Amino acid sequence: MAKTLSKPASGALAPWLGISLIVILFDQLSKIAILKTFVYGAQHELTSFFNLVLVYNRGAAFGFLSTAGGWQRWAFTALGIAATLVICFLLKRHGQQRLFSLSLAMILGGALGNVIDRLVYGHVIDFLDFHLGAWHFPAFNLADSAITVGAVLLIYDELRRVRGSR
């Protein structure tokens, strides 16, 4: 069977790493734009439910461990690097499984986008702020979005696989 761009050969890492690189690029460019446009804590209302803000997250998702004293920067950086190694192994091994690999590529790009922030700035830059009245969902960024979409696709792929085996 001829190899095509639509279906990478088993073990073909390049297409999936390319997707991860695109995620990283969009994530980092968006953060640079926010850093050049906003001062810390600034907020710009775009709609009745969405603002652009500039906040720093020294913790994990939803600010978990953000006040832990500094060790979490290196712990989450190490976790991101470990996840990178595991994901690259899985992509190498299962590169022919398109949805599975796409989900991992998105998670990888998002994880590395946030690792770059931790290494360069000492914290993750968040700027997307959705709210309903006075209640605000924790601010997040494009890397977080890619991780979330990747995780949802991963769950969907697994459910599809389980249903297909019945």
From Swiss-Prot:
Top EC class of this enzyme: hydrolase
Pathway recorded for this protein: Protein modification; lipoprotein biosynthesis (signal peptide cleavage)
Membrane topology recorded in Swiss-Prot or TrEMBL: Multi-pass membrane protein
Keyword Transmembrane assigned: yes
InterPro entries: Peptidase_A8
UniProt subcellular location: Cell inner membrane
Catalytic activity as recorded in UniProt: Release of signal peptides from bacterial membrane prolipoproteins. Hydrolyzes -Xaa-Yaa-Zaa-|-(S,diacylglyceryl)Cys-, in which Xaa is hydrophobic (preferably Leu), and Yaa (Ala or Ser) and Zaa (Gly or Ala) have small, neutral side chains
Catalytic residues (UniProt): D126, D144
Record-annotated membrane-spanning stretches: 9-29, 49-69, 71-91, 100-120, 135-155
Keywords: Aspartyl protease, Cell inner membrane, Cell membrane, Hydrolase, Membrane, Protease, Transmembrane, Transmembrane helix
Pfam families documented for this protein: Peptidase_A8 (PF01252)
Family membership: Belongs to the peptidase A8 family.
HAMAP family: LspA
Task of the protein: This protein specifically catalyzes the removal of signal peptides from prolipoproteins.
Protein name from the UniProt record: Lipoprotein signal peptidase
